[in-house]
Amino acid sequence: MSIVIPRRNWTTGTVYDYYRHDYGHYVTGSTSSVVTADSGATALYDATFYVLTDDNNVYKCLDNNGGVASTVKPTGTSNSILTTSPDGYKWKYMYSLSAAQQTNFLSTDFMAVATNSTVAAANTDGAIDIVKIKTAGSGGTDGTHTGISIKGDGSGELFP
């Protein structure tokens, strides 16, 4: 027995949704507009934020570079965020399907969910890997920045 999710094969030229826990929730300050994925999904279950490659590796999309088409297949099993170039997607390796999982739980419509102990051990509870800037302002420096302090009082979270 295995938990399964809809199968989503990586295909070049597809715009993938990036992972966001609040698809379908009201946009801040609105009572009529909801957070919608690039695919039009209004629920995380329907969003195309993960892919299965022909290497039988599963990746989660952390950033789709502003909604451009994915043209480079994510590869590798590193615990670091994988950036594909030139499309600019950022992916997180999640797990690989074993031969037994492929035989028993991989169909044209569904695929097994598995836990990779190496990935799980390398994760940090509460880590923030990607930050989306809503309004950038001016005077900043473009690029990747590390060691940014996150300050907040815990209010406004959707899932305490």
Task: Give each language-model segment a name.
Residues 85-160:
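Conserved, function-critical positions that sit in or immediately flank catalytic
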